[in-house]
Amino acid sequence: MLAAMSLSGIDRPTAAQLRAKRMALLAVAAPTLFTFLGVVLYMLHDPVPDTWLWVACWAIALALLLQSDNDAPARVAVRLVPVPLRVAHGVSALALVMIFLALHIANHLMFPAGEGSYDAVTKVFRRVYRNDILQPLVVALFLFQVGTGLFFVWRLTAAPSDRFRTFQIASGVYLAAYMLGHMDSVFIFARTYLRIDTGWDFATGDPAGMIKDPWNIRLLPHYWLAMFLVLSHLASGARVIMITHGVGKALADRLLVAGAVAAGHL
């Protein structure tokens, strides 16, 4: 994250600096990408250890970075994100919050209450977002978020940005990877491959649990960062809206920091 912020401040980056910035943003998503990779390899019966493939992928990425020209300026055209698409991204995010995310996060906050309370709340909430109309809509909204979000990332990283905008971009990269991986874990891995319910046992990694199992331990940063960054990303979007509507940048920046701090304490 810090490397991406530093590189994003360069006005006229070289080809190597631009590639390094984008690679640093991708590295922010490393915890969720590693989980995604592990799930996919598990369904393929682990043809190679996930750690080996993981190291190989980053070694290739590093080799590509080292081959980049650090003298020639990056040949990219700085183009703005279309306003209608940006508005659609925000509106669809708000729809997801109202239809699904608020209930889903509230459900997960029931973990300290124990399995019985968690499952009882899950059953109630699933009547809302798992019906034949809303569930396909939720999936479509998530895919729209991922597609438009990655398009924004590519456009926005072609231009310099301050640390607050870079944080918004980085959190978006993480969430795009997380959403794709989470939908794969739920719809393909759990419901199709294992044919199990995605309730308490699935969420907590039972019977081994998350802490003591060498595979499940990766789920802790995977889930915690998702919770932190989804709330922080919403705060980042609110910051942009406030600045657009005349709120002072300093105040909007402070409100984003406050939102991120609050998200980190959940």
Describe the function of each predicted region:
Residues 1-266:
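Membrane-embedded alpha-helical bundles that constitute the cytochrome b-like, heme-associated redox core
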